[in-house]
Amino acid sequence: MINTIEGFFMNYQPAIEVVRGGTVESIHHAAIAVVDPEGKLVASWGLPETSTYMRSSAKPFQVLPLLEAGGASRFDFSLQEIALMCASHTGTDAHVRIALSIQEKVGVSEGDLLCGVHPPYDPETADRLKQEGIEPTANRHNCSGKHSGMLAFARLIGAPLEDYILPEHPIQKRILKVLGEMCDLGGEEIRIGVDGCSVPTFAVPLESAATAFARLADPGSLSQSRADACRAVWQAMTTYPEMVAGPGRFDTALMSAAKG
């Protein structure tokens, strides 16, 4: 991890210059890794081995154990519901409806979520709730889909619903193992922090994260069950990009414009 200014400039190199009137106004640094599904580095900028927290970009991998264990068929999850489990959503009424649907199928409630509460990211929804005097609840949290998926996995394997956010909980141990396999890393090579929604978050080398995403998009080299889970995630997110974020959000707009 980078702990000094000197370390930052070693790992990240100038990538974009913003020019105004012939004068460079700002410089944006980056570390970039382009990797194929076999883990081969194809292109890079800066240091591709730079370690960084995946944060919400890990969500598609955090749902893989649930799908690989047969959770989609056990609970009859729709693609919309799987997309929400991978989402940093904006808390619209549409997102809340899907979160409630997941919870009803699993047999849990909004009160079981340990993600906390914040106002919806969607400005129109936030303004409406404020005008109506309605306090936001946990399902408005951008990570409510992910947490609902984690509760589903706990229910599926017969693990306690309580404390599902702790690193030592069986579902979090399984998530760490699967992420390590997707990244070609051992669990001891992954640094664990606490994400903003209270679950573990993972610091990995940039090229390792890129390997995981390359395999998510092209899972042909993976086991059948893992490949099927990856394809389900890919199909869900690209079919329902509005579930992954929401109206006016960059990732939803990009997936919609690029058809995936």
What are these regions (language model features)?
Residues 76-86, 112-116, 191-196, 225-239:
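Beta-strand segments within the central parallel beta-sheet cores of soluble alpha/beta enzyme folds
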Residues 54-72:
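Active-site SXXK
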Residues 24, 54, 139-147, 166-171, ...:
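Short, contiguous, pocket-lining structural segments
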Residues 5-12, 78-189:
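Active-site-adjacent helix/loop patches that line small-molecule binding or acyl-intermediate pockets
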Residues 224-260:
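Conserved SxxK-family serine transpeptidase/carboxypeptidase catalytic domain
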Residues 2-49:
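Beta-lactamase-like hydrolase cores
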Residues 45-53, 85-89, 133-141, 193-200:
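A short glycine/serine-rich beta->alpha loop
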Residues 200-219, 229-236:
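Active-site-proximal alpha-helical segments within enzyme catalytic domains
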